[in-house]
Amino acid sequence: MKFMELGFRPDTFYTVESVRSVSSDLLNDLVIQVKSTKYLLHKFPMLSKCLRLKNLVSSQETETSQEQQVIQLVDFPGETEAFELCAKFCYGITITLCAHNVVAVRCAAEYLGMTEEVELGETENLVQRLELFLTTCVFKSWRDSYVTLQTTKVLPLWSEDLGITNRCIEAIANGVTVSPGEDFSTQLETGLLRNRSRIRRDEILCNGGGGSKAESLRWWGEDLAELGLDLYRRTMVAIKSSHRKISPRLIGNALRIYASKWLPSIQESSADSNLVLESVISLLPEEKSSVPCSFLLQLLKMANVMNVSHSSKMELAIKAGNQLDKATVSELLIPLSDKSGMLYDVDVVKMMVKQFLSHISPEIRPTRTRTEHRRSRSEENINLEEIQEVRGSLSTSSSPPPLLSKVAKLVDSYLQEIARDVNLTVSKFVELAETIPDTSRICHDDLYNAIDVYLQVHKKIEKCERKRLCRILDCKKLSVEASKKAAQNELLPLRVIVQILFVEQARATLATTRNNITTNETAVLKRSFTTRREEGGQEEEERDETKPSGGFLQSTPSRFMALCAIPRQPKKLLCKLLSISRSLSQRI
């Protein structure tokens, strides 16, 4: 750390019963009261360098003729130590200045008026010497600039008026972003800050700190985390806006350190915690992956609990949505603080999914709008070519991008967790499930498990809601194990069970005879399936239009029941499907 020594005389100040005096052959003719300390001094050395004291003494001489004049400095900035250093400078006593006390002495010298206007002779007054020390020593050192900035919080208004705060922030920002080989050598990628500056010793004595010696082995992000919110925010803004670009990842790491230090420790005051959180969010870099998705989701959880502004929440959701493929299910369980009764914020997760889809490929969107009516996905897409494909393949010609498949699996796992919420509505569940495009789900096993969990927790939902919930399930994309479980699930609508059994039986039948099926025969079967689907769909829509409103709905036969006249009992249902299988084999 750099320091400056002024003066050459030994220290002759002493204390007698809380009164500070100077050892001298001359009688004391000036009494100065600073805070609770009284100083017995002499007019000549003090008035020759302090314009304020000179004016105060001059105004009192016209009113009183006492030999000892008493001056009370009631609004003196800082503590008595700063005043005493200024007084010793007036007497020529050696004083040592460094980053720890230069701000207090600079403010005291400004208050006392120790400028060139009152200085007698050719030597500079204290204000000029302090400014020279700040410019040539303190602001050339990252560590000294940081320590000096820390001390400005004791005298914030004076430091602002004198420009010390802004100059410290500017010096710190330059020290962080400067390139190697100049006054600072900042090893940014390893997180170490080393100072190799060599300061010229001009008219004042600057000592301390070797040129090649490492000034600090601590990362600058850890040091800045010790600052108060206002100084930290201003410093980070200066670093981000510097003409020398710094890695966004380092900015993000610094913000993570600051958030981990301050957010958990200010639970007493929600206003303070909100202010810290809002500031951290506003300082987040725009670049993707500059901060981990886990950190963004952690901030989003805090934002929901602390009720920060809606714009801040949306900013976090957008940033997290851009890298949703790196999230985990537990990180997506964002608590909901409103009075809806739901445990988790499903809407913000839905927004993140949509943001991810638009970010990774703007052309990708859910295949169905909210107001669009449709039957289940299995009913919409049944055709023989797809049934003949091996299990696990997609219904499209090409597999979806790996990131889309990963997010689809993440959403399905998330649905399994939130399905346990007794207050979760079917609409919320379905809307989130439908944000994933149909082609992005390679397998519907996880989606079925989520539906099963929801039905087990919400056994009293109406039949129309149960039917709506199961429409998002594509039976063709269920594995053998999932199909077996679903066929025996009494909570599923009977129509869904019929679809599952039909698809399984059709797949098994076609698997044994696919080598013998001609193109014409396949076309005939395909037209047969299409005709039956249209007839069953028309009959189902007519029944939906005549269904009673309110209470539990009467059971409506599914289109497959209408097609095949399948009884409601599972055993008879299975027998009927077996007969369908035999008839198909005979036709083939």
UniProtKB/Swiss-Prot annotation:
The modification Phosphoserine is found at residues 376, 378. Keywords: Phosphoprotein, Ubl conjugation pathway. The modification Phosphotyrosine is found at residue 448. InterPro entries: BTB/POZ_dom (IPR000210), NPH3/RPT2-like (IPR043454), NPH3_dom (IPR027356), SKP1/BTB/POZ_sf (IPR011333). The keyword Electron transport does not apply. Pathway: Protein modification; protein ubiquitination. Residues 218-507 form the NPH3 domain. It holds the Pfam family NPH3. The BTB/POZ domain mediates the interaction with some component of ubiquitin ligase complexes. Belongs to the NPH3 family. May act as a substrate-specific adapter of an E3 ubiquitin-protein ligase complex (CUL3-RBX1-BTB) which mediates the ubiquitination and subsequent proteasomal degradation of target proteins. PANTHER family: OS12G0117600 PROTEIN (PTHR32370). This is BTB/POZ domain-containing protein At3g26490. It comes from Arabidopsis thaliana.
